[in-house]
Amino acid sequence: MSEQNELNTLKSRFRGYFPVVIDVETAGFNAKTDALLEICAVTLQMDEDGWLKPASTIHFHVAPFEGAVLHKEALEFNGIRDPFSPLRGAVSEETALKEIYKQIRKEQKTADCSRAIMVAHNANFDHSFVMEASERARLKRNPFHPFATFDTAALSGLAFGQTVLAKACKTAGIAFDNKEAHSALYDTERTAELFCEIVNKWKKLGGWPLFESQTEEIDKSQN
């Protein structure tokens, strides 16, 4: 692979990390006590010219774990009126995360990345729920970095002057339907588009690849 082509890889662009966009819908704000009700993951890929774009999508409705707290206001907000309805087709936290992690590890390996890193809007919230659900399910092979994330709320505030997902998308020229919002599937797909737009915009502005002199300085600091 040529030096230029090497720079146009996820591995080089994100220091060995494999970015995965996540969104969750929950029954509250406390990741330890409140139910995880829906989760979606969108993986990303980089084309041969170095442009970032969405790859695959995996989505699950999730059944509340035993003893989970369900806050009425949260359910009204996300529109999940009956978390126990069989019509939701919900699976356990363990099943959802195992399938998501399986897909992530497969694509991460193909991209030759060392670890997955979560991309999310207000990422601390989604990250905390995924980590707690992994602990409850006793999943030892969690592909995500334990604390590092890419937060599109912060990134879009820098790039577009907007931190609310809907407003950031509209400012970036990404269609956003407020009626579809607060579905993990819809929000994850829009967040993925937003993150790709930010990364690609930085490339268009000349921010990536780094100049050779910058790369040399980084290499020296690591030796």
Swiss-Prot record:
The record marks 29, 77, 125, 147 as: Important for substrate binding and specificity. This is Ribonuclease T. GO terms for molecular function: 3'-5' exonuclease activity; magnesium ion binding; nucleic acid binding; RNA exonuclease activity, producing 5'-phosphomonoesters. Belongs to the RNase T family. Mg(2+) 2 binds at residues 23, 25, 182, 187. It comes from Photobacterium profundum (strain SS9). Its EC number is 3.1.13.-. Pfam families: RNase_T (PF00929).
